[in-house]
Amino acid sequence: MSDRHFVEPDDIESQLFDWGVLKWMSTPEVTGGERFSAGVVKLEPGKGHERHTHPESDEILFVIRGEGEQEVADETRDITAGDMVFIPEGVEHGTLNTGWEPLLLFAVYAPPGPEDVLRDLPECEIVPPGKLPTPENVTEES
């Protein structure tokens, strides 16, 4: 546990997937905050992830840049910079980048936990802090 008040991107490992990159800037291990986790998600153009749920965590997505399509339960909406999406625990959802530039999101889980599930997926590759999130920089532990 830490009590860090300021975190920079180079301080944090990256989770690399074929659809994009995640950097969890606030987790219990990084900042010591126990009630939520938060990070930046970058989805590459035309990429997205399959519908999934977080059985024990609510999720908030805030669109920083880009445009995409967000599914929540049986509703699908176009999203763009400035939009916010609330996904209650256990509700199936998915995100797709429909634009030509990366879709940049700020994601929050409350309580924390789904970020650890993502890290443990076989398709998740870990890039150490301070390294560009590219396949060449993946660590052996992935």
Question: Where in the sequence are the language-model features?
Answer:
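A short hydrophobic beta-strand segment most commonly corresponding to one strand
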Residues: 38-41, 86, 101-116
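Glycine- and acidic-residue-biased ligand/ion/polar-headgroup-sensing regions
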Residues: 56-58, 62-68
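A generic "binding-loop/recognition-motif" signal
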Residues: 47, 56-57, 75, 91-92, ...
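Short beta-strand His + acidic residue motifs that chelate non-heme Fe in jelly-roll/DSBH
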Residues: 50-52, 70-71, 87, 93-99
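Short acidic-glycine-tyrosine-enriched beta hairpin
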Residues: 74-89
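A short, N-terminal "cap"/entry segment at the start of jelly-roll beta-barrel domains
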Residues: 1-35, 50, 120-142
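Conserved short histidine dyad/triad with adjacent acidic residue
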Residues: 23-24, 39-54
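Short, charged/polar surface micro-motifs in flexible loops or helix N-caps
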Residues: 30-34, 44-48, 67-69, 111-115
